[in-house]
């Protein structure tokens, strides 16, 4: 009986202590990434680690959870050689690696596709828009990829990132 009570007490203590383990992805704050060369910005949660900038400084990638979570915000100069917005949207819709369960059809200058990436079974979310920046027309892309277990976290994070993913006034951030 004494052993039984000891096991029950240890089990209850372990359960109480497990409840006190803080989730490292709770209580985050938002940081701001500003690309002054391409004139755009995005807010990102502090649990993401900023990667190295590309050689062309066309954007930034972020990771978490040992790389299981991947986020990027990029901008490239728009050329017809790479295709129109309509062809880019069609390419995303026809991407055989994407199982799309949400799409925001192409409007005059932006679209969204989201779903499951078949090759790694992760959730993806992609927003693409055209920017008529002072230094030329650019295609801006926000791309997120994360395990399904992160859905609750990203349901909170994505709206903030979307709202903040925008052009900047060059004087404002230089």
Features from the language model and the residues they span:
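Extracytoplasmic/secreted proteins, especially bacterial periplasmic and envelope-associated proteins
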Residues: 43, 84, 88, 156-160, ...
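Surface-exposed amphipathic alpha-helical segments
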Residues: 48, 138-174
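N-terminal "mature-domain start" segment
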Residues: 21-56
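Boundary at the C-terminal end of the N-terminal hydrophobic targeting segment
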Residues: 16-18
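Conserved polar/disulfide-associated segments of primarily extracytoplasmic proteins
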Residues: 51-153
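Sec-dependent N-terminal signal peptides
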Residues: 4-14
